[in-house]
Design a protein with these regions (language model features):
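Extended, charged helical/alpha-beta scaffold domains that provide interaction surfaces
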Residues: 1-195
Length: 195
């Protein structure tokens, strides 16, 4: 039975190590970063401008604060403009603006390859930090899951379900931390003076 608990962590470890391998092999992470940006914008739009609520009830201020915290360069339309769109239109517009903001960030670098290297370093650091936290969290979950047994629930099923949710939260946190860091990087230009 302990092997089945270990199997859950092994599956998650394989996913994380594969991602680390891609980074360490020097693959361009550009598409990965763009996916992280668009997924983050989608998640925030779903959270603050739900299709289940009328546009007048959308929390545009909350959406703006959360997007701006991670992507400071992303400008939202006015609340009135946001509420005049469908959620799909708003999402599309914000994803376009998020991607454009990153293209502008890329243009701040003298060479695109410099940003590619920064992306790899940032992604690796964030993955490693979040993965270490996740290992600790999964260990605590495993220790605490035995208490679930009295509730006529299968502890292994509970561990798998909760562990899967926690893994999803970790991958979302990796994406959010990565793009936040990349959008907040300041590029310093060396100025050569003529003598």
């Amino acid at each position: 039975n302990l092997l089945e608990y270990d199997q859950v962590m092994n599956e998650q470890r394989e996913i994380i190590y594969e991602e680390r391998r891609r980074v360490l092999d020097g693959e361009s992470m550009r598409d990965t970063i763009y996916s992280m940006i668009t997924e983050y914008v989608e998640n925030m739009t779903d959270r603050f401008a739900s299709t289940e609520a009328d546009p007048e009830e959308w929390d545009i201020k909350g959406l703006d604060v959360n997007l701006h915290n991670v992507i400071p360069q992303l400008q939202l339309p006015s609340e009135k403009e946001c509420q005049s769109m469908s959620q799909k239109e708003l999402k599309h517009l914000l994803k376009e603006r998020g991607v454009k903001a990153y293209e502008n960030k890329e243009a701040e670098f003298p060479e695109a390859e410099q940003l590619r290297e920064v992306e790899r370093v940032v992604l690796l650091k964030v993955i490693d930090a979040r993965w270490m936290d996740h290992i600790d969290d999964m260990d605590q979950l495993r220790q605490g899951i035995g208490l679930q047994a009295y509730g006529q629930r299968d502890p292994l099923v509970e561990y798998k379900m909760t562990g899967y949710e926690m893994f999803g939260e970790m991958t979302n946190a990796i994406a959010e931390n990565t793009i936040r860091t990349l959008f907040h990087i300041k590029v310093e230009q060396k100025v050569e003076r003529e003598e």
